[in-house]
Amino acid sequence: MESGTVLLESKSSPLNLLHEMHELRLLGHLCDVTVSIENQGVHEDFMAHKAVLAATSKFFKEVFLNEKSADGTRTNVYLNEVQAVDFASFLEFVYTAKVRVEEDRVQQMLEVAEKLKCLDLSETCLQLKKQMLESVLLELQNFSESQEVEASSGPQVSVTPSSKASVPGEDAHSNGLVDSSDYPIERLGNGLSPETPSKKCKEKLDKKKDVAKPPFPKIRRASGRLAGKKVFVEIPKKKYTRRLREQQKSAEEAAENDKCPQDQSPDNERMETEPAAKSEACPASVELEESLQKVEGEKEEEEGKDGEEKKKSNFQCTVCDKAFLYEKSFLKHIKYHHGVATEVVYRCDTCGQTFANRCNLKSHQRHVHSSERHFPCEMCAKKFKRKKDVKRHVLQVHEGGGERHRCGQCGKGLSSKTALRLHERTHTGDKPYGCTKCDAKFSQPSALKTHLRVHTGERPFVCDECGARFTQNHMLIYHKRCHTGERPFMCETCGKSFASKEYLKHHNRIHTGSKPFKCEVCLRTFAQRNSLYQHIKVHTGERPYCCDQCGKQFTQVNALQRHHRIHTGEKPYMCNACGRTFTDKSTLRRHTSIHDKNTPWKSFLVIVDGSPKNDEGHKTEQPDDEYASPKLSDRLLSFGENSHFNNLLEVQGNVPAVQENSSTGAACKAVVSQDALLTTSISALGELTPQAVSMPAHLPSLTNME
């Protein structure tokens, strides 16, 4: 005999499952996706589970199913149209099926639900907005009734029947409301005496009195949530108000049909149908109607508006002639109603540069073209463009930076105890985090995580402007400043701004004269570590960069780039004082000293776009001034890292000009002595050797540029 089947069903299992998934997310366990929110300069990462997001949001489901990589590694999703606080509430809802938000954020959560295509959250928001609207309608109705009760001097009042119909399924007596069908209704007009109510209406009134109900019950608030505080009403969109009107109209018609029997006199029928007309004149109804029309006018401009309102409508649909005040509403309309997908170009009106989104455009306009500084420091009255610049200024200048957490060995100040503990590992050499694929070890887990991307080739951070990919998020942030032109880090000494804090730190060594990096071979010091690395190649003889046209090798990539300009003839750097062009900045910098010796810091640099220009006919502003040949000076400066060029003495006696192929095509003259010219001619302008330094004492050296 076969046994029957039984159904094993647990009602608590879904709730327990959600609870456990929520706990796993909070602890960061088994999370396989990171959602990065970057909106209005605020960046925040949220860890979650793909399965939960895909099950609750069609947007994430499409993203994850369309992924090319199915290796199970953690992926990153970037959202820039959602605020971090709204997405945090969204995550709490999908993991717990509930979330507590402020009343004025319900509309924001509805928009987030529509963007992420979360039907459950969307339905919840719509239901809540409907309840809020119904409570507001009851509030307005109660207020109008209380005003009528106070103003009425007779024992009978007219009550609009729409109050009961506005909240279907709710008992009006339980809320202390008056049922208009149970009380006689009078209308005074044109000096006529009031009509006598019907007998059946009187009987109903007597029955109500027998229940010990006062003829004018005390009107109280229909919603305990609204009692005792001022209500800020957010009227919903047009489709919800239209639906509410239809429900209200159908309820009024039903109230008119059921109010009195068909055998009543025409006078009573007229008397029973007049409350509908009177309800139109009710102050609450008029006020509600005006508010609804006002909201409809804000959401969707209608054809009957005057000239001023039409001017405010900046965007108009050519298909249905609807006008919109905001570009976002217009683009959403043509996309969902007419199926037109447009590509929006965010372009700066000042410089014409384009951006991927509006946030980058506003950031560019605010920090590049605008010189306004609205945020002053309370201690020194210095002004800044952003609030966080003020905070950083106060911390670094007035509060002594990281003095509160200072390293006992090197004296470096850190911003927190955690940063101090990690910094101390640089002295102890403790590196507890080792790579499983190589022998590399690190003192911080984040450094190990970044290192592993070298083996996997993962570059999860993508620039939406040019498509460049990076292994770390801060590298992407620095890169984006190349597109926006933002330079938020300013030098407190000279006011120069930089795109990254590292560049500012390198720049500050110019003012302090600090050169912490020393070569162990020749004991020469450098301000930057990269400069030391490049210098070490002088001792090792390493020249990894080779010219593909002539085979010459170089120690630095920028030296190879300068060398390439010899073959191409490109001279992209022009002096804005005399128009002369040069192949590199260093030659231009030496040249500009002839224009203004007293201000060596002044920049005459102009970067020339396109192909090299023919600069024939360009001469210096002072034709009597003669300056050294760039080619000769370049060779001299290449010796000994420019260490001897400043020691050259000025001698008397001019010689004929030394011809060279300069950017102007004109002859350049050098102020040298006869013996110096003879010496350079013998060496054929070759590269000087250490023996050349020990030349006879009677041979003077080259002079200054003049």
From Swiss-Prot:
Positions where Phosphoserine occurs in the chain: 611
Domain BTB, residue spans: 31-103
A biological process from GO: negative regulation of DNA-templated transcription
Coiled coil (UniProt feature): none
Segments of skewed composition (Polar residues): 149-165
InterPro entries: BTB/POZ_dom (IPR000210), SKP1/BTB/POZ_sf (IPR011333), Znf_C2H2_sf (IPR036236), Znf_C2H2_type (IPR013087)
First and last residues of each zinc finger (C2H2-type): 315-337, 346-369, 375-398, 405-427, 433-455, 461-483, 489-511, 517-539, 545-567, 573-595
Keywords associated with the record: Cytoplasm, DNA-binding, Metal-binding, Nucleus, Phosphoprotein, Repeat, Repressor, Transcription, Transcription regulation, Zinc, Zinc-finger
Biased composition regions of type Basic and acidic residues, renumbered to the chain: 197-212, 242-277
Top-level taxonomic group: Eukaryota
Protein name (record): GDNF-inducible zinc finger protein 1
